[in-house]
Amino acid sequence: MKVIISGGGTAGHINPGLAIAKYIKKREPDTEILFIGTERGLEARLVPRENFEIKMIKVRGFKRKLSMDTLVAVKELFQGLAEARKIIKDYKPDLVIGTGGYVCGPVLFNASRMKIPTLVHEQNAFPGVTNKILSKFVDRVAISFKEAEKYFKDKSKVVFTGNPIRSEMLEVSRETARKKLGIPKDMPLVVIFGGSRGAENINSTVAELIKRHKSDLGFYLIYATGEAQYDGIMKKIGEVKSPNINILPYIFDMANAMAAADLVVCRAGAITVSELTALGVPSILIPSPYVTANHQEHNARALERQGASVVILEKNLRPDILYEEITTLLKDRNKLSQMAKNAKSIGITNATERIYEIIKDIMKNKAAG
């Protein structure tokens, strides 16, 4: 079997694709898989790291306001459609999967027009524009939140699967992870990140928190700034001599970081929330207020209602508030343990298996009809 997977821009679109790819290879080792992405997206680095082939097309997202960028986006859309069609024609896939982001638009549209079996996966409770458009053309739409179904007109195509979790996220033990990361035996680990591109308000808050508590932090900290903001944040924080503070541009080994963590502080993107619950990790969630339909707060509140997370809205975020929330939770081991159990109880760990079964069903139906 030959499969094309397209999705990108942010890790939230790329990691589900990688999880699906690995599961397909596990079930059918002879499968050939090709990713299609853009040079600008994070997929240009993440996909090769996982030893999958990737080809690039030229396409970019549309801005809401009419400008020169809009004209460039239109030009690149037509270019991307042509490039995607050529790649598909040359590769001759048996199946094409989209995991969101503007790059999968030209790919899935072309595949559907070429009568190749197609599937899109939507990670969020409020579907993205690209997936809503593609839903009219593809064979199946896999959703991660049941609330998302109402946004798709043809309900017969929609199947609830949950979000794919990378297999390595489920295979690492806490003890092994802490040893690999060099976390002192009796020291709690807090992992903080704001997404693959970073988050300015979270970064400014955490930078100030570190400046104030360089010598008396009280826990081991792994903190990812996002690559674009790393240099500026390091300049703001100044010299950090503590061996218990590890500041990185990006956490490539998220499996070990999450498995080792006592507490995670992060945004409430769909994939992150799914990984937290699958692993049973307590969290402080700071939903992004800049996303469509405020879907991150909906994700965060769902965990809060289950007693798996504490939610701090960005408008209320300050260094003293965040530090107090972190230290209060770390001191109350019983509460932290209960939060972990609550998170685990709502996690879905077999989404990739569900998606694989849908894939087989699509291909069976295409072959029959």
From Swiss-Prot:
GO terms for cellular component: plasma membrane. Pathway: Cell wall biogenesis; peptidoglycan biosynthesis. GO terms for molecular function: UDP-N-acetyl-D-glucosamine:N-acetylmuramoyl-L-alanyl-D-glutamyl-meso-2,6-diaminopimelyl-D-alanyl-D-alanine-diphosphoundecaprenol 4-beta-N-acetylglucosaminlytransferase activity; undecaprenyldiphospho-muramoylpentapeptide beta-N-acetylglucosaminyltransferase activity. It is a peripheral membrane protein. InterPro entries: GlcNAc_MurG, Glyco_trans_28_C, GlycoTrans_28_N. It comes from the Bacteria. It catalyses: di-trans,octa-cis-undecaprenyl diphospho-N-acetyl-alpha-D-muramoyl-L-alanyl-D-glutamyl-meso-2,6-diaminopimeloyl-D-alanyl-D-alanine + UDP-N-acetyl-alpha-D-glucosamine = di-trans,octa-cis-undecaprenyl diphospho-[N-acetyl-alpha-D-glucosaminyl-(1->4)]-N-acetyl-alpha-D-muramoyl-L-alanyl-D-glutamyl-meso-2,6-diaminopimeloyl-D-alanyl-D-alanine + UDP + H(+). Gene3D superfamilies: Glycogen Phosphorylase B. GO terms for biological process: carbohydrate metabolic process; cell division; cell wall organization; lipid glycosylation; peptidoglycan biosynthetic process; regulation of cell shape. Its EC number is 2.4.1.227. It is found in: Cell membrane. Keywords: Cell cycle, Cell division, Cell membrane, Cell shape, Cell wall biogenesis/degradation, Glycosyltransferase, Membrane, Peptidoglycan synthesis, Transferase. Belongs to the glycosyltransferase 28 family. MurG subfamily. This is UDP-N-acetylglucosamine--N-acetylmuramyl-(pentapeptide) pyrophosphoryl-undecaprenol N-acetylglucosamine transferase. The gene is murG.
